[in-house]
Amino acid sequence: MYYGISQFSEAYNKILRNSSSHSSCQLVIFVSCLNIDALCATKMLSLLFKKQLVQSQIVPIFGYSELRRHYSQLDDNINSLLLVGFGGVIDLEAFLEIDPQEYVIDTDEKSGEQSFRRDIYVLDAHRPWNLDNIFGSQIIQCFDDGTVDDTLGEQKEAYYKLLELDEESGDDELSGDENDNNGGDDEATDADEVTDEDEEDEDETISNKRGNSSIGPNDLSKRKQRKKQIHEYEGVLEEYYSQGTTVVNSISAQIYSLLSAIGETNLSNLWLNILGTTSLDIAYAQVYNRLYPLLQDEVKRLTPSSRNSVKTPDTLTLNIQPDYYLFLLRHSSLYDSFYYSNYVNAKLSLWNENGKKRLHKMFARMGIPLSTAQETWLYMDHSIKRELGIIFDKNLDRYGLQDIIRDGFVRTLGYRGSISASEFVEALTALLEVGNSTDKDSVKINNDNNDDTDGEEEEDNSAQKLTNLRKRWVSNFWLSWDALDDRKVELLNRGIQLAQDLQRAIFNTGVAILEKKLIKHLRIYRLCVLQDGPDLDLYRNPLTLLRLGNWLIECCAESEDKQLLPMVLASIDENTDTYLVAGLTPRYPRGLDTIHTKKPILNNFSMAFQQITAETDAKVRIDNFESSIIEIRREDLSPFLEKLTLSGLL
């Protein structure tokens, strides 16, 4: 079943009712540990439940195998389970092997609705919805953003019609079995041997062989009509599931809608909402662009007039200020913020010498000496900083950078400084990716004596390495969680530093890829395979691989051919002898995003990867909540990609 936006408070009150009457913890939240939007949404929920004196347990989870393991370990007394950031695209009842009848405690005689001793709530913005969760289950309860009521009318009708037709077919089969038994063994055997290709002939043959003709012409006609309807409705559902995946909303925005409904909005929750939504800006710009005006209105509503406010060392404010498509401008130099910006790099091709010359000429045209541009922003000439917006407006059009200025959200932390939402998201993402130390210095793996181990031992060793790596990601989740606290400024600064280091590594890897021409054009998609490099270990983390992929995709969007081709990006992990593979959708050049906001480009890699895995003997692990990210054995990559190229699925 599902809750529309106006019904979120009903679900919340139900959770509260079931969880607040016990002295022990009855509420568990499973959260995707590599998802900033899910992190911020869970933080809001945690603060809300804490205010209501409801005990809850938060469990960061990496992928589906961990989901199954953690679910199997839940205590029987857990009556509410929230899945945040995942769960919407799979049949949860089947995957978790849930028998709803085991949990039934009451049934309403009039409506037929059942009450369960455990309810599973799904907060997930990935689409398409799995329709079994939405229409076929009462124990699975999904928070919907309007997708179901607005766009799934045809699919809803097809789903319920198929259920009715299945029941009718079951009744007919029971009736047919009884008649077959009355007709004798010989007749049944003869009927089984009929293999006519034409369905009509088959039905008539079966009817004739049953002697006294228990199936009349009307029954045959009904059967044919039923088969036609089943085929038609199955086609509707197949088309729905094969359309491709995307993210249609911010989970943080959905939780904030709940808070608005129950009167619990404040600046802290709004800031978390802004961070969660901003985290989608790079990969799902249409979602951010749609939600931005709503966030802007909410900031104006909750923020007191600056004329009446007095700044103190502990004042926490949230304002709308000019922001830029530049990398960590307030925490680096103007030059570096241009140089390491994905947007500027793609527009000016900074990865080659001509691009660097254009950048230097641009600063000269703006009247900003390179020596001044390379000063840390904090110490840069204040007159230039004050006039920066005007300088940009006058000079950046000729370089295609006219969209570099936009309004953004800035959080002021008293006398400790200020940070924009986009910069905060960069810091959080870096903490999720790297944590307390650089990836290369952590999780040291001993590769000694690998030649002396047999295949089974190597597999066990690889599994253990993967487990250790995922434990680190869970640890990084809690580091990012703590960084959301306004008092943990040192963690935030650590994240800023890590983000700068990561972006340099991404830039260096991206430049090497473009200079060596490692991106291959394979008719229907672009392919890039990383097999060496000083920063190769960084790309064991899906977030870092996607960071590199977004850098490359943006460069491709601004390239001369400007073909809207998706990309497959693969990186070798020598420790496990596998490739981490990500399928990325193409991207419109910046400036064209607003034209296409109503029709986002869907990711077809999820279905393609699953289908090709089913058709081949390749050892593939599809475990990530981002289903377009897979792990594949080294020797299986080439045949897998060959099959993908010829499949016609993209």
UniProtKB/Swiss-Prot annotation:
<comment type="function">
    <text>Required for initiation of chromosomal DNA replication. Acts at the origin of replication. Also has a role in minichromosome maintenance.</text>
</comment>
<comment type="similarity">
    <text>Belongs to the CDC45 family.</text>
</comment>
<dbReference type="GO" id="GO:0003697">
    <property type="term" value="F:single-stranded DNA binding"/>
</dbReference>
<dbReference type="GO" id="GO:0031261">
    <property type="term" value="C:DNA replication preinitiation complex"/>
</dbReference>
<dbReference type="GO" id="GO:0005634">
    <property type="term" value="C:nucleus"/>
</dbReference>
<dbReference type="Pfam" id="PF02724">
    <property type="entry name" value="CDC45"/>
</dbReference>
<dbReference type="GO" id="GO:0000727">
    <property type="term" value="P:double-strand break repair via break-induced replication"/>
</dbReference>
<protein>
    <recommendedName>
        <fullName>Cell division control protein 45</fullName>
    </recommendedName>
</protein>
<comment type="subunit">
    <text>Assembles into a complex with MCM5/CDC46. Interacts with MCM10.</text>
</comment>
<dbReference type="GO" id="GO:0003688">
    <property type="term" value="F:DNA replication origin binding"/>
</dbReference>
<dbReference type="GO" id="GO:0043596">
    <property type="term" value="C:nuclear replication fork"/>
</dbReference>
<dbReference type="GO" id="GO:1902977">
    <property type="term" value="P:mitotic DNA replication preinitiation complex assembly"/>
</dbReference>
<keyword id="KW-0131">Cell cycle</keyword>
<dbReference type="GO" id="GO:0071162">
    <property type="term" value="C:CMG complex"/>
</dbReference>
<keyword id="KW-0597">Phosphoprotein</keyword>
<feature type="region of interest" description="Disordered">
    <location>
        <begin position="168"/>
        <end position="227"/>
    </location>
</feature>
<dbReference type="InterPro" id="IPR003874">
    <property type="entry name" value="CDC45"/>
</dbReference>
<keyword id="KW-0539">Nucleus</keyword>
<feature type="compositionally biased region" description="Acidic residues">
    <location>
        <begin position="168"/>
        <end position="205"/>
    </location>
</feature>
<dbReference type="GO" id="GO:0003682">
    <property type="term" value="F:chromatin binding"/>
</dbReference>
<feature type="modified residue" description="Phosphothreonine">
    <location>
        <position position="453"/>
    </location>
</feature>
<feature type="compositionally biased region" description="Acidic residues">
    <location>
        <begin position="449"/>
        <end position="461"/>
    </location>
</feature>
<keyword id="KW-0235">DNA replication</keyword>
<dbReference type="GO" id="GO:0006270">
    <property type="term" value="P:DNA replication initiation"/>
</dbReference>
<feature type="region of interest" description="Disordered">
    <location>
        <begin position="442"/>
        <end position="462"/>
    </location>
</feature>
